[in-house]
A protein has these predicted regions:
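Extracytoplasmic small-molecule ligand-binding "clamshell" domains
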Residues: 1-67
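Short loop->beta-strand "edge-of-pocket" segments that line small-molecule binding or catalytic clefts
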Residues: 3-6, 24, 105-119
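Beta->alpha turn/N-cap motifs
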Residues: 6-10, 48-53, 62-74, 98, ...
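Extended ligand-binding regions for polar small-molecule ligands
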Residues: 28-29, 36-38, 119, 186-224
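Acidic, polar ligand-binding/catalytic clefts
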Residues: 32, 44-107
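Hydrophobic residues within well-ordered alpha-helices
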Residues: 34, 59-60, 108, 147-148, ...
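A ligand-binding cleft/hinge motif common to bilobed small-molecule-binding domains
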Residues: 54, 70-79, 124-127, 141, ...
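Periplasmic-binding protein-like
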Residues: 88-96, 159, 163-203, 222-237
Length: 237
C-alpha cells in the first residue's frame, strides 16, 4: 500500500468530494497513475490529507511516501526533500469580489490579501506589491470565507487553486496576470532516488500518451480553457 499526502481543501486540484466522500482532483490523477504503475491497481493507495505547512514534515517523519499537493518546487524546499520533474506550471494571481475595481496585485497596496500558511505566495505577494498586508489562513476555504465576509480584500495563490475557488463562488473573479512561476512537483523524502526516477517515468509517460491532457481537461478545462502543452521535464534532484 502506498501512502500519499494530498490536499483536501483545494477545489479541482485536491479536494474532498462531499457526494462520494473521496479525495479527488488533478493531483490525485498522478497519484493514481503512480499507484497503478507499481501495483497494477490504483486503489492500493491511502490518501492522507495534509495542509500546506505539513507537506514537507509529513515526508520527513515518514508519515507519507510521497506528496502531490499543489507544491511548488523551490530551492529551499529542495534542500529539505526531493522532487519529481515538473507536472504542472502554475503562477500566482488574485481573486477578488466580482464588483471590485482591482485589476492586479499592484492595485492592492495597503489592502488585506489572504493566502495559506506555508505557501510560496507568502513571499511572492510582498515581492510583487510591498504595501499589501498579507493575512494568513490554514486553508484556502478560510481565505474564501474571509473574502466573502469582507475581512480581506483579495485572495492570492496559484491560478489553478483560485480557479477552483471561483468555481465555488461565481460572484468572485480572477484578475491580473500571473506574477510568479510556480512549477509543481511531487515530493519524496531525501534518499530515494530510484523512487523519484520511477515517478518521473510515470509523469513522462502521462505527458506523452495523452493522460496528462485528459487530466487537465477533466479538472481545469471548463474554467481555464483547452489544455496547454505539458511542462518540460526539469528540476531534477
Amino acid at each position: 500500500m502506498l501512502i500519499a499526502g494530498v490536499r483536501q481543501d483545494v477545489p479541482l486540484t485536491g479536494f474532498l468530494n462531499p457526494r462520494t466522500n473521496q479525495i479527488e482532483g488533478f493531483d490525485v490523477e498522478f497519484i493514481k497513475a503512480i499507484t497503478r504503475a507499481i501495483f497494477g491497481d490504483e486503489s492500493k493507495v491511502d490518501l492522507r490529507p495534509v495542509t500546506a505547512a505539513a507537506r514537507i514534515p509529513s515526508l520527513q517523519d515518514g508519515s507519507v511516501d510521497m506528496v502531490a499537493a499543489a507544491m511548488t518546487i523551490t530551492a529551499d524546499r529542495k534542500n529539505q526533500i526531493d522532487f519529481s520533474e515538473v507536472y504542472y506550471q502554475a503562477g500566482d494571481r488574485v481573486l477578488v469580489k466580482g464588483d471590485a475595481s482591482y485589476n492586479s496585485i499592484q492595485d492592492l497596496g495597503g489592502k488585506r490579501v489572504c493566502t495559506v500558511k506555508g505557501s510560496t505566495a507568502e513571499q511572492n505577494i510582498p515581492g510583487a506589491s510591498p504595501q499589501v498586508e498579507v493575512v494568513q489562513a490554514d486553508t484556502y476555504n478560510e481565505c474564501l470565507l474571509s473574502l466573502q465576509q469582507g475581512r480581506v480584500d483579495a485572495v492570492s495563490t496559484d491560478d489553478v487553486i483560485l480557479s477552483g475557488l471561483a468555481q465555488q463562488d461565481p460572484s468572485t473573479k480572477l484578475v491580473g496576470p500571473k506574477f510568479s512561476d510556480e512549477p509543481y512537483g511531487i515530493g519524496v523524502a531525501k534518499g530515494h532516488p530510484e523512487f523519484v526516477a520511477f515517478i518521473n517515468g510515470v509523469i513522462q509517460q502521462m505527458k506523452s500518451d495523452g493522460r496528462w491532457k485528459a487530466a487537465y481537461d477533466s479538472w481545469f478545462g471548463r474554467f481555464a480553457g483547452p489544455a496547454p502543452e505539458p511542462p518540460p521535464g526539469t528540476y531534477s534532484n
